Structure formats: structure tokens, C-alpha cells
Regions:
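Single conserved position on a long alpha-helix in the C-terminal lobe of the eukaryotic protein kinase
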Residues: 1-3
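An aromatic-glycine-centered, glycine-rich loop/turn in mixed alpha/beta architecture
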Residues: 108-177
Length: 177
């Protein structure tokens, strides 16, 4: 992905991908979102940094500010800020054959959902959580599960670009049929 964005570094003025490349090269930066369509008025660019811990530290933000300051146009107002973390509770009911042992099943399902919500495993969809993703992850990781019903969140969750969904309380109910 960085290779594809490298063409932007040849441009005479910094583009969205130029800012992404510069910030992504800084240790500790996991994901960069650039709002370059004048989010605060003409000549403004907002850069949202997601660190490996979710929220970027002030030290990491300062490193990104310095890097962006070196490449920005004189008439561009660049604002570097951290992504906002939103804890999302997840409650699922899994159905398994009553002939199978249910020992440790709830813990395996909980570990599967926790793994789904790890930042490193999610690509660039850090602000989305869909029922389909939850169901697919559980059924892929725990082969004995016949059915998965997601009760929380009640619907797919899509937040603003500057927000990142992380795991809140994970509740698993196991039913035998």
C-alpha cells in the first residue's frame, strides 16, 4: 500500500497520500486518516492518527506535526489530532449441539471476538463493526458453533472517520440444541 502511495511524493505539493506516508513512517503510528477537503474551511487539512494503543500520545502527535510541517504548503493549516476511542459492548448467543461438551466454549468465543476487535487485525475499517464480521469470525474460529445471534450491538455500527471501535464488555451465552 505504501508503494502505491509513493507516487504522491513526486507531486509538487503535498497530497493526501503524502501526508499518510510521512506520518505512517513514524514508529508507533498504526493508521492515518487524512481529511483534505477543507474540513475547517479553505486551506485546511486534518490528520487523524491512530496508534497501536488506539489513542495517540502527545509525543507521537508532536512527531507527526513536525513531519507534516516539513512538507506542508505555506498557506495550508494542518491540524494533527488523535483518533477517539469508542468502547463497544458485544453480546452474542451461540448455539451448539447438546451432544458436544460446552466446557470452555464461552471463553473461546470471547477470545474470538476480542481478536476481531484488535486494531492490528482490522485493516482500515477501524470505525466499523458489523454483525456479519462478528458471526464470520466466531464461526471461523470455533468450528463447533452452529449458529450465532448478535444481540449487542443491535445493528451494524459505523462511526465517524476519526473514531475507533475497541472492545468493551463481551458477553457470551451458550445454548445447546
Amino acid at each position: 500500500e505504501r508503494t502505491l502511495r509513493s507516487w504522491s511524493e513526486l507531486a509538487l505539493v503535498p497530497l493526501r497520500d503524502t501526508y499518510i506516508n510521512v506520518c505512517s513512517a513514524i514508529a508507533g503510528v498504526l493508521y492515518v486518516t487524512v481529511k483534505d477537503q477543507h474540513p475547517r474551511g479553505q486551506g485546511t487539512v486534518d490528520i487523524i492518527i491512530t496508534s497501536e494503543a488506539g489513542t495517540a500520545t502527545e509525543d507521537l502527535l508532536e512527531k507527526c506535526r513536525v513531519a507534516c510541517e516539513e512538507i506542508r504548503e505555506p498557506d495550508t493549516d494542518v491540524k494533527v489530532k488523535s483518533a477517539e476511542i469508542v468502547a463497544q459492548d458485544v453480546a452474542v448467543t451461540v448455539t451448539v449441539s447438546s451432544a458436544l461438551s460446552q466446557d470452555g466454549l464461552a471463553e473461546r468465543v470471547q477470545a474470538s471476538v476480542t481478536d476481531l476487535l484488535k486494531l492490528r487485525n482490522r485493516g482500515d475499517s477501524l470505525n466499523e463493526l458489523t454483525h456479519a464480521d462478528i458471526i464470520h469470525k466466531i464461526k471461523s474460529d470455533v468450528s463447533t458453533v452452529r449458529n450465532v445471534t448478535v444481540t449487542t450491538p443491535a445493528a451494524d455500527v459505523t462511526l465517524a472517520e476519526e473514531k475507533v471501535i475497541m472492545a468493551g464488555k463481551i458477553t457470551v451465552t451458550v445454548k445447546g440444541v
